[in-house]
Every structure is written in structure tokens, then in C-alpha cells.
Amino acid sequence: MSVKIITPYVFEEEIKEHQELFWELNIHYEKDIARIGSDLMFQKIWNQYPKDDIFILHADMSPHHEGWFEEVLEYVEQYPEAGMFGCLLLYPATDKSGKHYIQCAGGKFTDERPDHFGSGLVLENRGTFKSELEVDTGQYNSTREVAWTTFGGCYIRRKFIDSVGNFDPSFEWTYNRDVDYCLSGRQNGFHIYQIPIRLFHHESKDNKRIKDESKIKMETRNLARLQTKWANSKFYKTLDKEIKNR
């Protein structure tokens, strides 16, 4: 099975730098002209490659080290039972000791809401929305099964996509569609693994700049839809299970 790397984007001027950073990869870039949101752009592009696995690479990501994508493919081959793999995403920012803050080491649930292992930093103003930020000390260096993973730095097998189909059309714009998609895949019998391949991620750089009051309301409605659909199911619970090396 071949894999297609996809990167939807909004701002033309930033893609040249992205192409330079990931020059060795054959990436499908496509501009979100209609502003349908990143989720529906993922779907639009992956439907253009119906026989390929998909790797979602955001426009605000950068490589952590050389050879990272080959390492991702090794994990994909090593764990055939997993339908989706999430990379370890780091903010391009460090603490005083030089350790990077973790943006996402997999998805979990906190107070009935989707949350990340990590996150909490707002790079635009160095503000925070969590009481404590988590730094990368190697605590996520193992392969772990998680409840869901964010659709960025994410490898999705074609059979996972074929099983779930398109995104639930009742969701709007973006945010929480990826959570719903992951839970739907798990309901269909797939596993989601978090792997210790690091990428830098600014986090929602495009979405933050085009967000307005109407989109904030869409996010709120999406959360309500997600909770109505899944909150009483066994899948709407944090999962953090270490997987043995093969």
C-alpha cells in the first residue's frame, strides 16, 4: 500500500517555507479557497487518492530530525493491527533547560471534553490555558494505544478511511470532527497508536487567524454533538496503554 502526504493550507506565502523544510517528501498541497476548514480539506484531498494510505501534515509543522518519515513507516509496518498512528508533536518552544513543550502526545478526555496529553501553550502571546505545561523528557518514548489522536502528524490506513467513510456531516467547520472519526474507527474494531516520532507543531496557526464569532459558535455546537453521540459509550474514555515492542 502506498501513502500520500497531504497538506491543505490557507496562506500562500507560508507554503514556500514548508516546501523547503520538507523538500524530500512528495506532498500534495491544496489551498482551502472556500474556507471549508482543515477537516473537510483532509477529506477532499484523501478522496482524490482512493487507493492510498494518508499522512496528514499541517502547514504549520516542521521536521524534528532527518529520516523521521521513514521511521513512521517502520512503525506502520511493525504494527499491522493499528489503523491510525499519531506522531509526538512538540511546540517550537522550550523551557529554561532547553526541553521542548509537548503539544500533543495523543488524545484523552478531561471533564467530558476532548483533551491532549500535553498542550496548554499559546505561542502567539506565550500565554497558557493549562495550569502546568508538560515538557518532553522521554516520558512518551514508547508506543501507546490511545482513545484518539489529532489529525496532524497522523498516518491513516486506507482501510480505516474506507471503514468510517466521510466525516459525519452534522459537524460544522472544524474541531472535534477528528475525535468523532477516531471513535468511529475504534467502534469498527481499529486501534489507534501514538508513536514517539517527533514533529514540531505551531498548533492551529491557520485556523486561529480565520476564526470569527460564527466559527466559535460552530466549535461549541460540535462539542455538544460529540458529547451527545459518544459520552455514554465505552469509547469516550481516556485510554493510555503501552504497547510492547515487536
Regions found by a protein language model. Give the residues of each.
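A conserved hydrophobic helix/loop-capping motif in glycosyltransferases and polysaccharide synthases
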Residues: 3-14, 75
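Conserved donor NDP-sugar-binding/catalytic core segment of glycosyltransferases
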Residues: 62, 66-117
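A short, conserved alpha-helix in the catalytic core of glycosyltransferases
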Residues: 72, 141-142, 147-156, 160-165, ...
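A recurrent flexible, glycine/aromatic-enriched loop bordering the glycosyltransferase active site
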Residues: 116-156
